[in-house]
Amino acid sequence: ILSGLVGSEMCIRDRYTVLTEGDASLDPVAEEVRSILDGHLVLSAELAQRNHFPAIDVLQSRSRLMDRVVEPEQRQLAGHLRALMARHADIELLLRTGDYVAGSDPLADEAIARQGAIEQFLRQDAAETSGFDDTLRALRKVLG
């Protein structure tokens, strides 16, 4: 995504698609593209295989412009969502092996408690539509 101004309004000016095979972080072309674009959405084959659509890997996707185009509340909510998702990813092996000790990490405990709601929030049927206000309200509820 490459942004720019149209009059006094910020807008998406261009969209580019880069197809990588395997780990995109090892692909020099993908890394170069990430370095120059204002934002990128990373699609995950693993999410698609789990029937999670849209298959956007939130933790790998970035926006350099988010702080400039969203209200402080939305920025805070999105940051908290990402923090919970990152912590859950950090402890996933401990959860699978039964080695996580509840109460040892408040953020991890919250991530575990909200994981189902987060996954449901991030899924959307192809025919489903959701306006901005409805989406923000749903995000507040997930993190509530």
Predicted regions and their residues:
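Conserved NTP phosphate-binding and transfer environment spanning the P-loop NTPase/kinase superfamily
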Residues: 17-144
